Amino acid sequence: MREITVYNTMTRQKEVFNPVTPGEAKMYVCGVTPYNHPHIGNARPFVTWDVIRRYMKHVGYKVTYVQNFTDVDDKIINTSNGEGVSWDTIANRYIDSYFEVMDALGVQRADIYPRVSTHIEDIIAMINTLIEKGYAYELDGDVYYSVDKFEHYGELSGRTLDDMEAGARIEVDGRKKNPMDFALWKAAKPGEPYWESPWGNGRPGWHIECSAMSQKYLGTEFDFHGGGSDLIFPHHENEIAQSEGCSGQHPAVRYWLHNGFITINSEKMSKSLNNFFLVKDILEQYSPDALRYFLLSTHYRSPLDFSDERLEEANKSLERLSTAIENLLYLEKCEPGQCEDAQRLLEKAKTFEEEFEMAMSDDFNTALATSSMFGLAKEINIYYQAMTSKEGVVCQEAIAEVKRIFKFMTDVIGVLEKAWEGNTGANAAEYEELMQVILSVRQTCREQKQWALADCIRDRLSEIGITIEDSPQGARWKKREV
């Protein structure tokens, strides 16, 4: 297998990926709290991990991908009380919304989507173990984790307990042994969902769910844990304390990966600034591929500034890729024969393929990888223009290999899947026949020097998303995908 290096937040350096189980890659990514429709900040980690998963599979790893839903949470409870409906009605509504927009963005479904509400027994069992081992204590129906008991606390975030206490905004509770102790179980309150437990009715704290569910499905040690950089502290720091305190396995996670923040026109995204964008609203103006490519155009660890201008640029960039795909599909149908130009194109394609894989193997650098993808697209389009400007044959073996390489790139990045289908579908034959009639009429107009009418046909077709291209071999049409 190709060697892969990843930046590990825990060690603050790049490391060669060495899986727990040879040939396998087990990953857990913190999912959404479904109390509203997903926003642009939610989309980035899931698109990022979708590409990581795709590439790991390409390299040859058997990937197990778990992503949770925090369907029991204060925000969900507040929303349900405000609307006068049950908490699970809210959670199910926005889980459905999550799948709708992520499916549109081409995010492949995780292998497992555990929910807090269906793993209460696992959570209670883990809390019991932590109490038995002296890492947690019960107070009037609440259960807290004692951070002083865990020697590695603060290693992920690079903070000492003294630093945390000095800079933390925490709810003052004089009952706790340490102000930084965090809740594993919360005693029931009026108007909130609750479950029976050894400490009385209540519900889980925020952090314990991910420890319980990741260990259940991936074991006490697994390869990747991901999420936004805002989760490093306290969520992921607390996860480590819980998971390692329970199992005794150190480390519980070999590689911690965190994506950077998204800003809106260089400002932090927030509802108070009225720059809080939902994915579903963005997709009303831009194609899913444009948004997906935009999210991947910058290295996942770097900040990403969202703006209409950047999305417009992404849209135009994808048009170049779409044109290259259309040109490859056209070249496949050309007369076969020996062609040195096609062989030279193939050699360039192999170079771009190697550069693409090197970039993806270096901490999943999609920004650099996509530059190789666009480099190959440019060469394909140059070759197409040269071939269609003269009568000639095409080396189909070379073109088939170029197509394989280019499709591999777009498949890993996860864009333009439909473009590869070409003009197919239930009515493809009838559509093609109709277009040939239109092209024939337009050609007659050109032969009779009715230029205005010929141009009118071309322009009207363009208005409905169909591009006409003229060449010495005749006109061809293609439907724009973006």
Regions found by a protein language model. Name each.
Residues 268, 276-482:
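Structural preference for alpha-helix termini/caps and helix-kink/transition segments
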Residues 80-87, 111-117, 228-229:
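The substrate-binding groove and active-site-proximal loops of carbohydrate-active enzymes
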Residues 1-35, 46, 50, 64, ...:
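Alpha-helical recognition segments enriched in aromatics with Gly/Pro capping
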Residues 61, 135, 466:
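Short phosphate-binding/catalytic loops that engage adenosine nucleotides
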Residues 11-14, 20-106, 473-477:
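N-terminal, positively charged nucleic-acid-binding surface of large information/translation enzymes
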Residues 69-74, 95-98, 108-123, 141-150:
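Short, glycine/charge-rich beta-strand/loop segments that flank catalytic centers
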